[in-house]
Amino acid sequence: PSTQQPYQTTMHGIHDWFDHYNAALFENKLPNFDDIKIKRIHGALGQVVYTTYKTREQKFVLEMLPRYETKKMFLETLVHEMIHLYQMKIKNDTGNHNKLFFGFRKKLNFLGLRLSR
């Protein structure tokens, strides 16, 4: 699909692009999300939801919209959420939009993607 046409989110697309950007940005060190949901989200383009159970086990769930204005918007959102997963799961960071998060900006620019809040 063209990067300027509306993009329909699919599990297959999420998994394929996750693998692509995991190799390009994280040297294949980023673990998969524990679960993925395609759903309507109010006030966000995507999000990582994490829960901690009594066992102190953490679960990281990726939530993506069913449809994006463009494929590029889908890709930027997916990579944005992958960076949050990296912060929390690999670096034990807060997952906020901080220096670690924005440290990926140059890499994304090189790949033709924008990194924003």
Language-model-detected regions and their locations in the chain:
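Walker B catalytic acidic pair
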Residues: 81
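Active-site-proximal or metal-binding-adjacent scaffold patches in catalytic folds
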Residues: 1-76, 85-117
